[in-house]
Design a protein with these regions (language model features):
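Short, Lys/Arg-enriched N-terminal segments with co-localized hydrophobic residues
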Residues: 1-4
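Sec-dependent N-terminal signal peptides
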Residues: 7-18
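Cleaved targeting-peptide boundary
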Residues: 22-29
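Surface-exposed amphipathic alpha-helical segments
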Residues: 23, 39-42, 83, 130-159
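A generic structural signal for beta-strand entry/edge sites
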Residues: 25, 49-51, 101-104
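Secretory pathway targeting signatures of secreted, lumenal, and periplasmic proteins
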Residues: 29-77, 108-111
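Surface-exposed aromatic
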Residues: 60-65, 103, 130-133
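Signature of long, low-cysteine stretches enriched in small and polar/charged residues
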Residues: 80-129
């Protein structure tokens, strides 16, 4: 009976831990979302390791920020187009989310998580120009936060 009680307590504790972790995993629901670029922002591609994750294992990410002149009229159209593109590559995607001047699409394929961001930049002359940001991670989604983008891209702010 004592062994059974201890076992049940262990099961309850494990269930509690799993529930807490499951809640923490929702990192794709951004609360800091609208992207702000400095006036002298330069498009760039960054390759490297996510802070503190490279402890004996390779965790690779790619970040691309580029001016993107779209023939798509709205952020939602851009998001739908990116979603379709990811699904064509075998990714399971969330519905595109539009908030403020930003749209993002998240897709997962095995252990690869891809994010597409597009930012409507009022400073760009063409109404149909976006600055696109592509973020690809091959690591456990629960281990990172959106704030890492700000560390990787000097001058980028999410608010």
């Amino acid at each position: 009976e004592k062994i059974m009680k201890k076992f049940m307590m262990l099961v309850a504790f494990a269930a509690m831990c799993f529930t807490a972790n499951a809640q923490d995993v929702k990192t794709h629901e951004f609360d800091k979302f609208v992207a702000v670029y400095p006036a002298d922002f330069q498009p760039k591609i960054v390759w490297g390791d996510v802070d503190g994750f490279n402890k004996g294992e390779d965790h690779l990410f790619e970040v691309v920020i580029d001016p993107y002149c779209a023939t798509l009229a709205t952020l939602k159209d851009f998001g739908d187009d990116r979603k379709e593109s990811l699904e064509d590559k075998g990714f399971k995607c969330d519905e595109p989310v539009v908030k403020g001047n930003t749209v993002y699409v998240r897709g997962v394929n095995g252990n690869e998580v891809r994010y597409w961001f597009a930012v409507k930049d009022a400073a760009l002359p063409d109404e149909e120009c976006f600055r696109g940001l592509f973020w690809c991670l091959t690591t456990d989604e629960a281990k990172y936060k959106p704030i890492l983008l700000e560390k990787m891209i000097p001058g980028l702010k999410l608010k």
